[in-house]
Amino acid sequence: MVELCGGEGEGQIMLATELAQLRAMARELEAKMDPDRVAARELCRALASSVDRSIRLAASCFPPPEHPPPAAGNAGRDAAFKKRKGMAKVRRQVRVTSVQDTASLDDGLSWRKYGQKDILGAKYPRAYFRCTHRHTQGCNATKQVQRADGDPLLFDVVYLGDHTCGQAAVAAAAQSAPPEHAGQEQQRQSSLLAAGTEGIHQQVVAEPMAAPFLFTSTAAGGVDDGYFSFISPANSDCQFSSDFSAGSVGVDMDHEARFEDLFSSTLEFFQSEIQNL
């Protein structure tokens, strides 16, 4: 058995001695190879033993490190993983109004998408975003967005790290906001608006037609031809009345807009009658 070296300098001397002896045995083996095979065989055994001692000396004096140094490519990856592991993580769920709706995912912050990949066992891919001020202001905030498997209108959003750029105040307000997103509020307001519009429409339809319009005119020569009324075939509820008298021509100004519609329908009726002649 070879004794372990006591110190680094002593171990180097013993190792150098063994290697020198090994070199001498190799030269002697080369000289005796052909004349005496028995002696050459014994010399080979001694050579193998010397090599074994040299290896043991080297192992005892220069032990390998407990953890081998990582490769250059893995070092940066491990450092980035440890850095992300120590970041603050905030999870939120955002509900959209439709499958094509992506505006509801806007949280008021400036992000840039840098990747997307399929997740094992997940139905939808996961998108990765980082702050747009990462290179200009050194902001390392990131977020991950993925559609929920059971509900295509629900998104899982994960924020990693805090914003250190100029939009830090906006980010704090967004992360402290309740889960209900602005898209839901917009949908609620749209429903209320639709209901209000429907009520207005019903009111307009149910409103009765005003009294018949009075159209006065003076006939040629000032002769009073009397009074006649006309029911429009386009709308039986609209009555057009005329009274030829000596008065001036006049139209009720409160119903001016409705009179224009009635006049248009009457004109269309007369045009169709003329074409049939």
UniProtKB/Swiss-Prot annotation:
GO molecular function annotations of the record: DNA-binding transcription factor activity; transcription cis-regulatory region binding
UniProt-listed GO biological process terms: defense response
DNA-binding region in chain numbering: 100-168
Main location: nucleus
Cellular compartment(s): Nucleus
Coiled coil start-end: none
Pfam hit, one: WRKY
GO cellular component: nucleus
UniProt entry keywords in alphabetical sequence: DNA-binding, Nucleus, Plant defense, Transcription, Transcription regulation
Induction profile: Induced by benzothiadiazole (BTH). Induced by sphingolipid elicitor and chitin elicitor, and a compatible race of the rice blast fungus Magnaporthe oryzae.
Biological function: May play a role in defense responses.
Family membership noted in the UniProt record: Belongs to the WRKY group III family.
Alphabetized PANTHER family for the sequence: TRANSCRIPTION FACTOR WRKY19, WRKY TRANSCRIPTION FACTOR 30-RELATED-RELATED
Record protein name field: Transcription factor WRKY19
Organism expressing this protein natively: Oryza sativa subsp. japonica (Rice)
